[in-house]
Amino acid sequence: MSSDTQRWFGVVSLFPEMFQTFTEQGVTGRAVKSGKLKVDFFNPRDFTHDKHRTVDDRPYGGGPGMLMMVQPLLDAIRAAKQAAEKKTKVIYLSPQGKTLTQRGVKQLSENESVILVAGRYEGIDERVIEAEIDEEWSVGDYILSGGELPAMILMDAVARLVPGVLGHAQSAEQDSFSDGLLDCPHYTRPENLNGQSVPSVLLSGDHQKIKQWRDKQSLGRTWQRRPELLNDLALTEEQQRLLDEYQQELLQQNGSYSGMRGYDE
């Protein structure tokens, strides 16, 4: 896919107005204004045929809550597919989906067009999922009122990977999780803040030593705060050496690993 290809999102949502600021400000706003990202909305309420524009219905079997009405939702999804003009992946933002990771974001960023279905109420009819949904994605194990916020999270993460969207070409590469690790600490002026100074290596002007320090901090921070991430990585000899150095330096400072943030959780 060409780097200058416009990415398109079709969002199926009962509350498209929630996306207004999101598509006008920040990274996604710049992407939309520059033409690198296009977002169209398909409100199931616009596909109703009764005077009340009903979009919810009772679930079979009883129980609390309502489901999104099938007919308006199906029509909205199909309208989005037609607008895409080509076979497009349809994603349902669901707590039952696979957890969104940076690896998944990279995969999604390779698609020129994606349709996002933001559920409401207690969810959507299982038959709609089976017939119209290609993948289900979750942003975490917690409860939200709808799929709009997860849809924004997914779009923001994808937009950052679209060439030319970020101000610096290396910004996305240096983000946390871009290489499977957490990001290193960052510092700006003043050089001394409440008695705490910027690490001297960052003031040295030695780019090789600065990179080495950042790599070490990234590895060490991941080991301390998200050690499970290291299980999925095959560290190079240099990375393992840097991590060993980080651990030894902490031992010398603290006398043990106990009490370090995340270590004994």
Swiss-Prot record:
Any Pfam family hit: tRNA_m1G_MT
- The enzyme's first-digit EC class, named in words, is transferase
Task: Write out the residues that bind S-adenosyl-L-methionine.
Answer: 119, 139-144
Q: Please indicate if the UniProt record lists tRNA processing as a keyword.
A: yes
Biological process per Gene Ontology, one example term: tRNA N1-guanine methylation
State whether keyword Transcription applies.
no
What's a Gene Ontology MF term here? tRNA (guanine(37)-N1)-methyltransferase activity
Q: What is its EC number?
A: 2.1.1.228
Q: Where does the source fall among the domains of life?
A: Bacteria
**Catalyses which reaction(s):** guanosine(37) in tRNA + S-adenosyl-L-methionine = N(1)-methylguanosine(37) in tRNA + S-adenosyl-L-homocysteine + H(+)
Q: Tell me the compartments it is located in.
A: Cytoplasm
One Gene Ontology cellular component term attached to this UniProt record is: cytosol
Q: Which PANTHER family match?
A: TRNA (GUANINE-N(1)-)-METHYLTRANSFERASE
Entry function:
Specifically methylates guanosine-37 in various tRNAs.
Family per record: Belongs to the RNA methyltransferase TrmD family.
**Under what name is this protein listed?**
tRNA (guanine-N(1)-)-methyltransferase
Q: Which gene encodes it?
A: trmD
